[in-house]
């Protein structure tokens, strides 16, 4: 396969409230696990079925292929195989995704995005403020069996690029600075939460590789997230004799903005160049994919200082997004590939998100608005 040029189908099989909050309306839940706790099993199943049936369909795969992308990364929950009630499984939707991907010449990276007890305490890990999975050997083993079942079911599909073992297992530094830390709905449940230690993560990755490689054809890639520690891996995968693997790192300009008070293109360029060098250094040993990135930035959303026509303001916004996109694509094109987060937020492209800045997280809108051009 050529260099990975893809997009994520997040918020389809793994919910994230900020992306399309409508499904959570009236429940008081902040994440998918609590949605299941706030609703009856029947109501949860009905809500998820309605969402999964409508949020992504065949026309989206056609759209993605039309714009020259070659891969979709699909986050899936640990309960994909319908064995953790009350949460309905969703393997039948991933089955459809493979049919559509193969029809339009796309590859799929299956991304195991959550685990029982969470690996990061984010809403995208299933339950906000709780991060205890790595301390429960039974659930660690369960997660490995989910990976095995994914490999058995999809390993021989033509459209399978590979399987990502686990999304964003959190480091100590990221854990202590994450806004979600300390925001658990049930404080008792969150007791004992903490980061995922590097020795544990290395052993889990070795175990996951052994189980997956025993099932997957050798041409299928096994992908490992860097755990927010890109520079720590060095030659680990080489020393362990792992073949046809890749390292996934997630790079967001907007995250840098939380720590740097100046939001200007020259600051973004410095940051992007530093991340590019880090990716290139890690890639001396193992191919690196920038598995999540987007063009969201405060400079593009900053209102012009002088009053002007709406058309002129939109032009300035577009040019600022184009500049940021060009910077990032130039950098990430030196890696093994890049995967935009996310393909969409709201299902309807005519419906405005609740906050204007969210538009830049929606790749379909970025492409239609000419904010990003993969061919330049």
Each language-model region and where it sits:
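Hydrophobic faces of well-ordered beta-strands that scaffold small-molecule active sites
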Residues: 3-9, 72-74, 108-112, 161-163, ...
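Active-site beta-loop-alpha junctions enriched in small/polar residues
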Residues: 10-12, 77, 113-117, 165-168, ...
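Aromatic- and acidic-residue-enriched segments that line the glycan-binding/catalytic groove
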Residues: 17-30, 88-89, 117-135, 178-185, ...
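The substrate-binding groove and active-site-proximal loops of carbohydrate-active enzymes
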Residues: 44-52, 78-91, 129-141, 169-171, ...
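Extracellular glycoside hydrolase catalytic/binding regions
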Residues: 159, 168-326
């Amino acid at each position: 396969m050529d260099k990975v040029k893809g997009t994520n189908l997040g918020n389809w099989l793994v919910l994230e409230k900020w992306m399309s909050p409508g499904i959570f309306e009236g429940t008081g839940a902040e994440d998918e696990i609590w949605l299941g706790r706030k609703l009856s099993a029947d109501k949860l199943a009905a809500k998820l079925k309605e969402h999964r049936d409508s949020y992504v369909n065949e026309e989206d795969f056609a759209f993605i292929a039309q714009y020259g992308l070659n891969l979709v990364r699909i986050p899936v929950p640990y309960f994909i195989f319908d064995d953790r009630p009350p949460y309905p499984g969703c393997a039948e939707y991933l089955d459809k995704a493979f049919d559509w991907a193969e029809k339009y010449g796309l590859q799929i990276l299956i991304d195991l995005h959550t685990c029982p007890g969470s690996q990061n305490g984010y809403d995208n890990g299933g339950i906000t403020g709780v991060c205890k999975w790595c301390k429960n050997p039974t659930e660690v083993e369960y997660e490995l069996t989910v990976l095995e079942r994914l490999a058995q079911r999809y390993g021989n599909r033509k459209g399978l690029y590979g399987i990502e073992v686990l999304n964003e297992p959190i480091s100590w530094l990221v854990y202590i600075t994450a806004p979600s830390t300390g925001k658990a709905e049930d404080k008792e449940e969150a007791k004992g939460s903490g980061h995922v230690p590097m020795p544990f993560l290395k052993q889990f990755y070795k175990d996951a590789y052994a189980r997956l490689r025993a099932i997957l054809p050798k041409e299928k890639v096994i992908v490992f997230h860097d755990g927010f520690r890109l520079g720590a891996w060095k030659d680990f995968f080489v020393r362990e004799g792992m073949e046809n693997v890749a390292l996934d790192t997630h790079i967001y300009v907007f995250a840098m903005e939380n720590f740097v008070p100046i939001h200007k293109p020259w600051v973004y360029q410095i940051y992007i160049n530093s991340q590019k060098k880090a990716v290139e250094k890690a890639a001396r040993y193992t191919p690196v994919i920038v598995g999540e990135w987007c063009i969201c930035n405060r400079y593009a959303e900053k209102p012009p200082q002088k009053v002007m026509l709406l058309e002129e303001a939109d032009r300035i916004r577009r040019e600022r997004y184009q500049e940021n996109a060009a910077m990032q694509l130039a950098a990430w094109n030196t890696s093994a590939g890049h995967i935009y987060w996310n393909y969409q937020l709201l299902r309807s492209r005519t419906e405005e998100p609740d906050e204007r800045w969210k538009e830049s997280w929606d790749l379909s809108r970025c492409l239609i608005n000419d904010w990003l051009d993969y061919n330049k």
